């Protein structure tokens, strides 16, 4: 069998912002040609309706670059029924790590206020614009148009912060020279043992393609209030309807994952002849923010730059609502790649079972986040016939029981004999919680296949609630900031969700922080 090297094409999209003059003509865009269902808002009772409520398009921009991805509600802080008049209502949106590489905020939480090397961001790299988008009824938001549905982008009043990134989340790092994973704790003196390749060390920390951003909504701001009323409240209602935190995040074994059908809905950026409208932070809104002297707003970067409507009108590619459902009705949802389909592609996916990828055994799965190289780790889903286009990175992957199985991040490419890569129809997702499973230990390694990657098999991990093998997970942030997700953990009887309350490493950090506060001397 011919073995092909495997790469992946990320599903986020980067656009160079066009320079525009005063005069312009709105482009006539072609209709996006695809077998998937597009630009159709799911009705109540539709299997895609829950994905629709939870999901948004994300848009980050610097002074020269525009980046798009897809995100979904994972958590929040505040009472949605009686929101505060002074403190912002905080929403937490999950997406991919490679999507939030576009978020570079000097007022972010540490260590995200600098790059991964501890250096200040360059002026051209700083995020100056952020907006949330959704394909919806424009009339709900006061947009005057004859269109019954449109892509509506709303600029929030402040630049988001980073709540969590799944980089360096396990005690393993990858040696680019030997193509093997090593335990970091086994390295006595990493600075001496690492080898320099070009300008970087041979060792790369592990990452999972998952991250969470914090978006503050100041409800005295018209645009933030629109986001809260028309985007966030329906998402919270659906989140709770699906069972809230305790029921929403699945932890299935690999055999159970193989049998699932996965429901996905996202926002790829493609040429699509739909109406698109932006609701920006106009001059009158920005002035209101500046004269409103709320101290809490000093903790955030308020947006002072906006996109004008003509920026969208002359843009050929627009975020477009897509479902992994065929127009003909031949299929609804995605199945994992079968062994037969994998053999037809002559592709080694480092898999343990049908359609399950082990990223630790594939050397081409790596990325740069905030100017540092990372190597992908953990388990993934190889989704047959799910090649969503750029902009769909971060799409939520729900199983048939309406539980969160993972997050979509790209499309597989295979290296051909002539040196060119061929894009496949296979989508890829990162599994968020990997159950302790005998199948992980039973897998036997093939020496022939090891030429394409490491012989190491990924360990169990849980990047939502944590476990003994996961040193960096989202519940740590949720506990520190007392979010809704942590309140659900506290009230739950499920012990597997409560690891954060018994994490020995976290307890050491908390005790050290208390000791530091107690030993502080105050000088008058």
Curated annotation (Swiss-Prot):
It is found in: Cell membrane. Keywords: Cell membrane, Lipoprotein, Membrane, Palmitate, Signal. The keyword Cell membrane applies. It is a lipid-anchor. A lipid is attached at residue 22 (S-diacylglycerol cysteine). A lipid is attached at residue 22 (N-palmitoyl cysteine). One of its GO terms (cellular component) is plasma membrane. The keyword DNA-binding does not apply. Residues 1-21 form the signal peptide. SUPFAM superfamilies: Trypsin-like serine proteases. It holds the Pfam family Mycop_pep_DUF31. Belongs to the MG067/MG068/MG395 family. This is Uncharacterized lipoprotein MPN_084. It comes from Mycoplasma pneumoniae (strain ATCC 29342 / M129 / Subtype 1) (Mycoplasmoides pneumoniae).
């Amino acid at each position: 069998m011919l073995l092909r090297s495997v790469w992946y094409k990320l599903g986020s999209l980067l656009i160079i912002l066009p320079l525009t003059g005063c005069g312009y003509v709105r482009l006539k865009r072609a209709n996006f040609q695809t077998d998937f269902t597009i630009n159709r808002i799911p009705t109540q009772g539709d299997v895609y309706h829950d994905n629709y409520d939870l999901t948004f398009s994300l848009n980050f921009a610097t002074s020269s670059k525009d980046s798009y991805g897809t995100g979904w509600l994972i958590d929040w802080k505040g009472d949605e029924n009686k929101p505060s008049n002074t403190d912002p209502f905080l929403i937490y949106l999950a997406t991919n790590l490679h999507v939030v590489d576009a978020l570079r905020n000097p007022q972010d939480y540490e260590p995200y206020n600098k790059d991964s090397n501890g250096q200040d961001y360059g002026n051209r790299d700083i995020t100056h614009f952020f907006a949330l988008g959704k394909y919806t009824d424009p009339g709900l938001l006061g947009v005057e148009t004859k269109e019954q549905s449109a892509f509506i982008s709303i600029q929030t009043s402040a630049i988001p912060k980073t709540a969590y990134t799944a980089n360096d989340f396990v005690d393993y790092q990858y040696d680019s020279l030997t193509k093997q994973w090593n335990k970091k704790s086994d390295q006595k003196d990493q600075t001496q043992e690492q080898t320099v390749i070009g300008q970087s060390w041979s060792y790369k920390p592990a990452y999972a393609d998952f991250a969470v951003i914090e978006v503050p909504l100041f409800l005295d701001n018209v645009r933030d209030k629109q986001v809260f009323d028309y985007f966030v409240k329906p998402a919270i209602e659906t989140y709770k309807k699906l069972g809230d935190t305790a029921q929403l995040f699945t932890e299935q074994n690999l055999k159970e994952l193989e049998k699932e059908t996965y429901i996905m809905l996202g926002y790829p950026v493609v040429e699509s002849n739909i109406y698109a409208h932006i609701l920006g932070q106009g001059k009158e809104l920005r002035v209101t923010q500046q004269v409103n002297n709320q101290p809490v707003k000093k903790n955030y970067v308020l947006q002072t730059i906006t996109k004008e409507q003509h920026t969208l009108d002359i843009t050929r590619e627009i975020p477009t609502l897509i479902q992994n459902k065929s127009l003909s009705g031949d299929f609804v949802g995605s199945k994992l790649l079968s062994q037969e389909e994998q053999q037809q592609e002559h592709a080694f996916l480092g898999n343990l079972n049908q359609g399950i990828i082990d990223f630790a055994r594939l050397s081409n799965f790596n990325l740069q986040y905030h100017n540092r190289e990372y190597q992908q780790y953990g388990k993934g889903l190889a989704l047959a016939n799910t090649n969503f286009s750029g902009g769909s990175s971060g799409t939520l992957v729900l199983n048939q029981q309406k539980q969160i199985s993972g997050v979509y991040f790209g499309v597989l490419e295979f290296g051909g004999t002539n040196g060119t890569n061929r894009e496949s129809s296979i989508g890829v997702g990162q599994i968020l919680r990997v159950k302790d499973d005998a199948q992980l230990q039973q897998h036997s390694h093939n020496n022939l296949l090891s030429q394409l990657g490491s012989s190491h098999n990924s360990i169990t991990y849980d990047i939502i609630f944590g476990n003994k093998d996961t040193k960096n997970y989202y519940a740590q942030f949720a506990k520190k900031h007392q979010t809704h997700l942590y309140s659900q953990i506290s009230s739950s009887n499920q012990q597997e969700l409560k690891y954060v309350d018994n994490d020995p490493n976290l307890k050491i950090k908390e005790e050290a922080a208390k000791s530091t506060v107690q030993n502080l001397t105050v000088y008058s």
